[in-house]
């Protein structure tokens, strides 16, 4: 199996090393694992692509590259340059440091990398490690993802739904903020939304007197509705959420047509 991996935390992020280990387990001794990841931190860039300026790319080692772009850029660089036409059998994005559940899905570069792979017609999975009080004292905060990641991905490869429609299916996987031994299992869960974690800005003044703003988010430990992604994570389960690129509110189409059509 040929596997392409990327992330949004950058080429030197510890979660990428975790994903490389997961991918090596899946690829097997005769497989290939290719890494094309951002040269710098790209958290929060969602599905952005750098079509207004060129992207520098550097080979760091065998099958390992850093690109000065977003996770979606990295997927494009891999498919149309690095791999020289060879198609990966699977694209994995992560393992993100922090959860990409609930509204974080919409901001996540990790999810954006998987989304671009799906739009290119490839099976793709985004993986993230929820962090919390139970992971703070661990020598490896990615312990849960490292221990159970290959099994969860293999489960999706063997039993998951994959299709060839225009807005292809891909998966968002979040590992709960618990030690690996405390994992309670996995749950298929819809994307949820938190009520008190909206982003805002925090103003500051520089030493030279210039005003600047930091983007600030809310607490991540707030649960979503029962049975949705962040809620099951906080109960100790891996959340597995099928996603599509289609953002249409299909449940509102007929009602809107009746009102204004």
UniProtKB/Swiss-Prot annotation:
GO molecular-function term, one example from the UniProt record: 5'-nucleotidase activity
UniProt entry keywords in alphabetical sequence: Cytoplasm, Hydrolase, Metal-binding, Nucleotide-binding
Transmembrane segments: none
Compartment(s) of residence: Cytoplasm
GO CC term, one of those recorded: cytoplasm
Major localisation: cytoplasm
Catalytic class of the enzyme: hydrolase
Family as reported in the entry's similarity comment: Belongs to the SurE nucleotidase family.
Protein's UniProt name: 5'-nucleotidase SurE
Species per Swiss-Prot/TrEMBL record: Cereibacter sphaeroides (strain ATCC 17029 / ATH 2.4.9) (Rhodobacter sphaeroides)
């Amino acid at each position: 199996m040929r596997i392409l991996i990327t992330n949004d935390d950058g080429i030197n992020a510890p979660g990428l090393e975790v994903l490389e280990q997961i991918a090596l387990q899946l690829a097997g001794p005769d497989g290939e694992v290719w890494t094309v990841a951002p040269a710098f931190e790209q958290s929060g860039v969602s599905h952005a692509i750098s079509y207004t300026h060129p992207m520098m790319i550097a080979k760091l080692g065998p099958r390992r590259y850093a690109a000065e772009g977003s996770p979606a850029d990295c997927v494009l660089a891999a498919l149309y340059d690095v791999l020289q036409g060879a198609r990966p059998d699977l694209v994995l994005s992560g393992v993100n440091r922090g959860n990409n559940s609930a509204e974080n899905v919409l901001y996540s570069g990790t999810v954006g990398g998987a989304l671009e792979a799906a739009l290119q017609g490839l099976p793709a999975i985004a993986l993230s490690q929820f962090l919390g009080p139970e992971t703070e004292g661990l020598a490896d905060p990615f312990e849960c993802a490292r221990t159970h990641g290959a099994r969860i991905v293999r489960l999706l490869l063997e039993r998951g739904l994959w299709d060839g429609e225009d807005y292809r299916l891909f998966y968002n996987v979040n590992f709960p903020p618990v030690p690996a031994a405390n994992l309670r299992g996995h749950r298929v869960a819809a994307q949820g939304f938190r009520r008190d974690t909206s982003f805002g800005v925090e103003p500051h003044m520089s030493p030279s007197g210039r005003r600047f703003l930091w983007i600030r988010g809310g607490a991540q430990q707030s649960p979503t509705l029962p049975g949705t992604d962040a809620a099951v994570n906080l109960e100790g389960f891996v959340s597995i959420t099928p996603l599509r690129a289609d953002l249409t509110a299909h449940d509102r189409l007929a009602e809107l047509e009746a009102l204004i059509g």
